[in-house]
Amino acid sequence: MKQYLDLEKYVLENGTQKGDRTGTGTISTFGYQMRFDLQEGFPIMTTKRVPFKLVVSELLWFLHGDTNIRYLLQHNNNIWNEWAFERFVKSDDYKGEDMTDFGLRAERDSAFKEVYQAEMEKFKARILEDEAFANKYGELGNIYGKQWREWKTSQGETIDQLADLIEMIKTNPNSRRLIVSAWNPEDIPNMALPPCHSLFQFYVADGKLSCQLYQRSADIFLGVPFNIASYALLTHLIAREVGLEVGEFIHTMGDAHLYNNHIEQVKEQLSRTPHKLPKLVLSDKPATIFDFDVADISLDGYNPDPAIKAPISV
């Protein structure tokens, strides 16, 4: 997609070198927006393969209000493993090798990388096999799904923001309050990772549903391709339920950054030419957005260039 490649190019040419929480370092810009017409095809990278089923299972995980990586691992989705693993290795229950700064060390030390990978595999297996262990160390805190589906009020009640949003689109589509927030300041200290994609708003006009996302922190190479596809999919799912066509997905970013250890991968991607976008295929079976399974969602005509691997910064 040209919009995304333009973002990569802009940050490479105009970004500012900054330090960051992970110690990796970034090239960053502040305030950037992309627009995608969802009528023109499903917005997923074609200049590198994005594993769409991982996008699907993560979004369904959010929709279920789940915050435990066990569901993700059951669907061969490893994208949240590092944050749960980090919590485990910092606990008194962990008795293995020192895992301090495991992400950076694994990138720089091949011997340590083997040790880390072995510990991670043991951790994943135990999450899948031991329910009590999973309940304790698979939890990531009150992240996205919890805030979307079960926001706790000061009175101790809960708000299902997503269900309320869908009902409001049906009954008051002209509302300017079609908003869901994952940013709950009270819960931030107890989250494995505070929400990067923190707030989204829907807009209805001319029989079409559009979505705008505000993302406070945008990992351009690894995270943003997932975010674009995830919120485009969410827009399609909600539009189906409320009887509207899809309009635009607008992606507004605060700190949009390229990690310093992703620069060569970005240059490789920029050398490639975008292909035709695929079409989203949804099963007619699910009655509501909350009834979808991974098998109910697929892409037709997705023929991307090969994947480009890059390290994740934790």
Swiss-Prot record:
Q: Recorded GO terms, molecular function?
A: thymidylate synthase activity
Residues that bind (6R)-5,10-methylene-5,6,7,8-tetrahydrofolate: 219, 313
Q: What class of enzyme is it?
A: transferase
Q: Where in the cell is it found?
A: Cytoplasm
Pfam families in the record, alphabetically? Thymidylat_synt
Q: Which GO terms describe its cellular component?
A: cytosol
In Gene Ontology terms, what is a biological process of this protein?
dTMP biosynthetic process
Quaternary organization: Homodimer.
Identification of the protein by name: Thymidylate synthase
Species of origin: Listeria monocytogenes serotype 4b (strain F2365)
